[in-house]
Amino acid sequence: GLSDSEKSAVASLWEKIAPQTNKLGAESMERLFKNHPETKSFFSRFDISPGSQDLLTHGGKIFGALGEAIKSLDNLQKYQDLHTNKLKLSSDHMKLLSAAIIEVFTAHFGGEVNQAAWNKFLGEVGAILTSS
């Protein structure tokens, strides 16, 4: 699990992210597609052009789930059933998405991002969401 200082680092940055979850979620998906074009095939029904409503909506859903997880940093296991079936994410793809998310956070918030804490948090959320 995350240490108290890691939880604090994640929660404090989230306060700045929360008002712009759709925008930052969409940017994270755009970054994922740019870094790993092969992932576009999972979104064949989406308009994946930058800033599209599909990306804003889906990015917002992903970040909404992260926000819910952050509210329960002490009990992340309760998210196990939430997205696994709906997202059908492999752990490899979750790692790629997590890296894209951290890149976007760093681009927006620079030194305020505790990358180690966010890597650990996204890794734990990813492990929960991709376990069967």
Swiss-Prot record:
Keywords: Heme, Iron, Metal-binding, Oxygen transport, Transport. GO terms for biological process: hydrogen peroxide catabolic process. InterPro entries: Globin, Globin-like_sf, Globin/Proto, Hemoglobin_a-typ, Hemoglobin_oxygen_transport. Disulfide bonds: none annotated. Transmembrane segments: none annotated. Heme b binds at residues 58, 83. GO terms for cellular component: blood microparticle; haptoglobin-hemoglobin complex; hemoglobin complex. Residues 1-132 form the Globin domain. One of its GO terms (molecular function) is heme binding. Belongs to the globin family. This hemoglobin may replace myocardial myoglobin in this amphibian species. PANTHER family: HEMOGLOBIN FAMILY MEMBER, HEMOGLOBIN SUBUNIT MU. This chain appears to have diverged from the line leading to alpha-type hemoglobin chains close to the divergence of alpha and beta chains. Monomer. This is Hemoglobin heart muscle subunit alpha-type. It comes from Aquarana catesbeiana (American bullfrog).
